[in-house]
Amino acid sequence: MAGHKVAHATLKGPSVVKELFIGLALGLAAGGLWKMHHWNEQRKTRTFYDLLERGEISVVAAEE
């Protein structure tokens, strides 16, 4: 029994380069999603003010 060896997985420390690339990829993905959301909100706001300026909509409640 003393001669038997069990294969164990060797644990390595964290790979700094790999973690940097993963962090960079996640950061760019999150930043891209945030910019797309921001552009969508800008488009909605711009459309609202364009319609308001042309008189197609009003922010004053219509009196009956």
Curated annotation (Swiss-Prot):
PANTHER family: CYTOCHROME C OXIDASE SUBUNIT 5C-2-RELATED (PTHR34372:SF2). This protein is one of the nuclear-coded polypeptide chains of cytochrome c oxidase, the terminal oxidase in mitochondrial electron transport. Signal peptide: none annotated. It comes from the Eukaryota. GO terms for cellular component: mitochondrial inner membrane; mitochondrion. This is Probable cytochrome c oxidase subunit 5C-1. The chain crosses the membrane at residues 15-34. Keywords: Membrane, Mitochondrion, Mitochondrion inner membrane, Transmembrane, Transmembrane helix. Its main location: mitochondrion. Belongs to the cytochrome c oxidase subunit 5C family. The keyword Manganese does not apply. InterPro entries: COX5C. It is found in: Mitochondrion inner membrane.
